Regions:
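N-terminal secretory signal peptides
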Residues: 1-74, 78
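N-terminal trafficking/processing presequences and adjacent post-cleavage segments
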Residues: 1-32, 113-159
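Generic marker of "main functional regions" within proteins
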Residues: 11-14, 42-47, 73, 86, ...
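Generic alpha-helical secondary structure signal
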Residues: 39, 49, 67, 109, ...
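Mature, folded catalytic cores of secreted/periplasmic enzymes
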Residues: 40, 88, 157-159
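Aromatic-residue detector
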Residues: 60-72, 96-101, 106, 140-156
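An exposed acidic His-Trp-rich patch
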Residues: 71-132
Length: 159
């Protein structure tokens, strides 16, 4: 099966059902790593380092995202990026429970860089459009403020 077939089953005439992964434990404050989304972001964004998982063969990076409002309220979601350009929300929740989301994979608009999935894919989790080798590599990229390989790519090619 090609990548296109795997990412667009609804266009094949038969919809394939994907088994949803079990959500990780709720995030803990000491495991949150803040990352920069852009100058117009009103929320602060964090990845729970303990939840970061890399499935290299599937080209998938799973993580818990915390979006903190200016008032301090947290929106928590269990998400994934399928490198280089697909995104999915598996579940949303709070500190005590998760609620599964039934939506499938959505394309990331990488060239515009709009939105959290685009920033995570481009700057942290899909360097040179490839998947991270390990969760430790992703945690390192978050702590550095970006993946070191990203900054060597020519910016004028729309990567």
């Amino acid at each position: 099966m090609s990548d296109w077939e795997r990412n667009h089953p609804e266009q094949l005439g038969t919809v394939q059902t994907e088994r949803l992964p079990a959500p990780p434990a709720p995030p803990r404050q000491e495991n949150l790593i803040e990352f920069y989304v852009g100058p117009t972001a009103t929320f602060r964004y964090f990845i729970d380092a303990a939840s970061l998982t890399v499935l290299y063969k599937q080209k998938e990076v799973r993580y818990v995202l915390v979006a903190r409002s200016p008032s301090g309220a947290d929106n928590v979601s269990f998400e994934a990026i399928r490198c280089p350009d697909m995104h999915r929300i598996y579940a949303v929740g709070d500190a005590s429970k998760w609620s599964e989301r039934s939506g499938g994979w959505q394309e990331i608009q990488r060239r515009t860089g709009v939105g959290v999935p685009g920033v995570l894919a481009r700057e942290y989790f899909c360097p040179h459009r490839d998947t991270l080798q390990s969760a430790a590599e992703g945690v390192d990229a978050l702590r550095r403020g970006g993946h070191p390989l990203v900054f060597t790519a020519p910016r004028n090619l729309g990567l």
